Regions:
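Core RecA-like ATPase module of SF1/SF2 helicases and allied nucleic-acid translocases
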Residues: 2-224
Length: 224
């Protein structure tokens, strides 16, 4: 495998994997890529975040349809309010990805220095407090690191650059549909990291279960 997997080449880039564990799993790639971020660490429970980290929002009922599941963002600011025992996060997102009519009262919107972007600001309480929390999700961080994500999680998303990691121990889990989902996440740059034996076995398995036309489409996509 190439060390390129652990380094960004362009701003809007993602690494897609099937497995979470191991050297080339989602967890380790996220850890290494976050480690290359020179900004200060902020530890919230067992999680660590830095300004500049790439994130994806989770399906959090707290934000209704505003900050929705799989919304891409970048952490622009983190501040700790020790007196009120909470954290404040400012996240930069695509302006056209949200409808301001759905903005909850506990989310502020701020101008971004980047054209086509908008910043959203909200707090996360350090502890669950039924008396102070407006809902039961006020102490839950509503996003995860997203330098690397699963192929399943990437459905419906697009990135300028996509790097797909396929190790020999998970190649039997790669169906044609999973592989096609992965390679079609890339708008422009696409790289697949696998060894020649894995590539041969995967395409042989596709050949047995799918038409030659389907395989030709996939091969053509990889050449683009």
């Amino acid at each position: 495998m190439s060390e390129e997997i652990f380094h960004y080449e362009i701003e809007d880039e993602i690494v897609l994997c099937l497995n979470y564990d191991g050297m080339y799993g989602i967890n380790n790639i996220n850890k290494i890529r976050q480690g290359a971020n020179p900004n200060k660490e902020f530890t919230f429970g067992v999680d660590t975040y830095k300004i500049g980290d790439r994130i994806l929002f989770n399906d959090c009922p707290r934000f209704n349809d505003f900050l929705f599941n799989n919304l891409k963002g970048t952490i622009k600011d983190i501040s700790i309010d020790a007196e009120n025992k909470c954290w404040w996060f400012t996240i930069e997102i695509d302006e056209d990805s949200v409808d301001l009519e759905y903005r909850p009262l506990d989310v502020a919107t701020l101008d971004s220095e980047v054209e086509g972007k908008i910043n959203v600001r909200f707090k996360v309480n350090e502890f669950a407090d039924k008396e102070e929390d407006e809902n039961e999700y006020g102490h839950i961080i509503p996003f995860n690191l997203a330098y690397a994500i699963s192929i399943h999680k990437a459905q419906g998303l697009e990135f300028e650059s996509v790097k797909i990691v396929i190790t020999s121990n998970i190649e039997d889990r790669i169906s044609k549909n999973i592989f096609y989902t992965a390679i079609t996440r890339a708008k422009n740059n696409l790289k697949v990291y696998w060894n020649s034996d894995s590539q041969t076995r995967i395409f042989d398995s596709f050949q047995k279960r799918n038409s030659n036309k389907d395989i030709a489409i996939i091969r053509q996509k990889l050449k683009q």
